[in-house]
Amino acid sequence: MVKSNLQTILNSHCFVREKESNIPKMPVIELTRNKPESESSHRCSNPCPGPLWCSDVPLPPLKIPGGRGNDQRDHSLSAKLFYSDAQLLVLEEAPQSNSRVRFLLFERRCSVSKHLVWRGALKGTNLYIEIPTGVLPEGSKDSFSLLLEFAEEKLQVDHVFICFHKSRDDRASLLRTFSFMGFEIVRPGHPLVPTRPDAFFMAYRIERDSDGDE
């Protein structure tokens, strides 16, 4: 079984507190298996933006290769076809036993730019995406737009989360780019994200038309 760089921080509904350890890099999504669903999880409020979640936990380390080098190929060794069309290929990694989280790999088809794979975790109606380390290749914005469109139309998610390290050289550029795409910074202390002062979290809320609205 391939060890994923995207470890999990999601349990059935709420994050669990991580034991003290060295956390040198980016946050990731981690699943605690066999965690019973708590009654309090159903009472969580949703002070948007962001998904319905409870947490104040730090996140474990992250290193997302983003499709550069052999690490990317390792991700797809156990992955199966999830969706395919003329523009986008989506693979699903082999699920863990009793896992409620689905790990997906998104790749734009027919791209003339450097190969890029976005990796994310789907939990319920929320999709969590980590920004690959290093400089994003040309065309990455277009491929992420395809990901967002797929998340809205095919996955029917309510929110998309992204996270990246504050120490990135391209931090300002990432903030501008994702803000332009409709993402909002999730403020420190927000109940929907873990406490990580070294990381930026941004959230995209997918608005849906209501038949009852005038």
From Swiss-Prot:
PROSITE patterns: ODC_AZ. InterPro entries: Acyl_CoA_acyltransferase, ODC_AZ, ODC_AZ_sf. GO terms for biological process: polyamine biosynthetic process; positive regulation of intracellular protein transport; positive regulation of protein catabolic process; viral translational frameshifting. The keyword NADP does not apply. It comes from the Eukaryota. GO terms for molecular function: ornithine decarboxylase inhibitor activity. GO terms for cellular component: cytoplasm; nucleus. The keyword rRNA-binding does not apply. Keywords: Polyamine biosynthesis. Belongs to the ODC antizyme family. Interacts with ODC1 and thereby sterically blocks ODC homodimerization. Ornithine decarboxylase (ODC) antizyme protein that negatively regulates ODC activity and intracellular polyamine biosynthesis and uptake in response to increased intracellular polyamine levels. Binds to ODC monomers, inhibiting the assembly of the functional ODC homodimer, and targets the monomers for ubiquitin-independent proteolytic destruction by the 26S proteasome. This is Ornithine decarboxylase antizyme 1.
